[in-house]
């Protein structure tokens, strides 16, 4: 059986993919992804996925807040995935922006 870290990693990647697919929709489509206030739900929001990816891709572990440390866990697979997407701090209140 997969460990909880592996399951969380897969969930974050799945939701990151969903964010990529739906990125062309209006910001109102992301209203349901607002932070819910608990670590578990923060890890799976579009808003925090962009922040997690930025932090992982740029290796700014020293500036992590606790939730990003928990979500990222210095996973090389997540870092490599994020490096392909993010090179600068996300804009639009943290919603993801792809590299061009």
From Swiss-Prot:
Tissue: Expressed by the yellow cells, peptidergic (neuroendocrine) neurons of the central nervous system.
MF annotations from Gene Ontology: hormone activity
Signal recorded as keyword: yes
Range of residues in the leader sequence: 1-23
Keyword Signal: yes
Keywords, comma-separated and alphabetical: Disulfide bond, Hormone, Signal
Membrane-crossing residue ranges in chain numbering: none
Post-translational modification note: Three disulfide bonds are present.
Function, as annotated: Stimulates integumental Na(+) uptake. Controls the activity of sodium pumps in the integument, pericardium, ureter and nephridial gland.
Annotated protein name in UniProt: Sodium-influx-stimulating peptide
Source organism of the structure: Lymnaea stagnalis
